[in-house]
């Protein structure tokens, strides 16, 4: 899959996520894409005697080319004898490449759009650009400057209370099995994300624990306290369209999603996908512990990860 971004014009995310009921019980909770042509400002929608949400569908005659709700339901899946439930699902995530276009990271217009649309502040964009350039230099191992550059980065971030260098290697060799923990976390449980150092001790050199990657954009949440939003046992494979089960369950935390501050070639992506957390990366805390929370707002979507 192309690791760079994708462009989707005239679209936004709302405070709505897919509940997975139409897709085999998928628990990923992806944010939904909404074309602006499908939406209407509340101030305009409420000027009539009743809103369009209350309108009777029979009031609007359907033409031959109209798409009904039944048509949409039928289009969500097809037969797939090789899958666990005999279905191949089609959703916005599985079909992303068909309705978006390639967006190279060097296209400056996307960053201008991030700022002018309100998706990002100027300060956040500048921090992301500084990190991207610093990382590019720090990974030049052949010049022998990678290690001291990463050390300097960590020292500076420690002084200002920032995020440590988020792209270090895990401690476990790839040919060894990574550890697991069974906390049996349930929705509503209060947990603290372990330190980055503790999490690296559970990852192999490819930054994976039992096949699940720990992303650089999860590092800012290390040490923070959140409630468990849901467990993840089933998810829709975006490449195959098949429902799959996790051999080692994970959880989603409330108010925690990818901020795309450290994403390679996808800086500033507004998709805000929920991060998945192995239980070994978390620890229970007392109910009296203050919770860190963030709000998921309406965002413009002009780029998205492929």
Predicted regions mapped to residue ranges:
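Generic structural signal for buried aliphatic residues
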Residues: 188-192
